[in-house]
Regions:
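Catalytic cores of nucleic-acid ligases and guanylyltransferases
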Residues: 1-193
Length: 193
């Protein structure tokens, strides 16, 4: 009997490619949310982007929907290696320093030339192979994202759980700019964005 590979079950909901999707943007909070509904991620200092892989082409959009594929040529080239027929990846374009920090002014300077230092840090997957994933839990979307970018130059933004009583403000000399709590449930874009 020959070995038969089972095709993984499709996730999400069958849907046409949606085009640009309004971003779920961070907002200021007074108290750190905790519990099963929340995960936390490092907030990088860069350009928020949405990478579209469709019809054998890659496009990179700003958070306002402007096509910056030519400005982020390296990111587009890196995204070409994503293991998917079609996808929408949400992330941040950064220039990482040796200590892991990111600095927006360094990124702006890199974009003045032909930068080879910029990197996409991916943190969400909104669409995959003809299926809309936005109603799925964030943890499930991130698990699929990690699979499709494995072996590429794209970095994966790990998430972590933290309880509000144990967290404190970021130290002034912290390697990270900030961290961002995200709802572990379905994707919600902010109105008017």
């Amino acid at each position: 009997v020959a070995f038969q590979r089972r095709k993984p079950a499709a996730i999400g909901f069958k849907a046409p490619f949606p085009g640009f999707v309004g971003p779920a943007l961070a907002s200021s909070i007074v108290r750190v949310p905790s519990g099963a509904r929340w995960i936390h991620e490092i907030k990088f200092d860069g350009y928020r982007v949405q990478v579209h892989l469709a019809n054998e082409a890659v496009k990179v959009f700003t958070r306002r929907g402007h096509d910056w594929t030519n400005r982020f040529k390296k990111v587009a080239d890196d995204a070409w290696h994503i293991k998917a027929g079609s996808a929408i990846v949400d992330g941040e374009v950064v220039v990482p320093a040796a200590d892991g920090t990111t600095d927006f002014s360094v990124l702006q300077n890199e974009l003045k030339g032909k930068s080879t230092s910029i990197v996409l840090v991916a943190f969400d997957l909104l669409y995959l192979n003809g299926r809309d994933l936005r109603k799925l839990p964030l943890i499930q979307r991130k698990a699929e994202l990690k699979k499709i970018i494995a072996g590429t130059e794209i970095q994966f933004s790990e998430s972590f759980e933290i309880e509000a009583p144990t967290c404190s403000p970021m130290p002034a000399r912290s390697a990270w700019r900030a961290w961002s709590p995200r709802s572990a449930t379905a994707y919600t874009q902010r109105a008017g964005q």
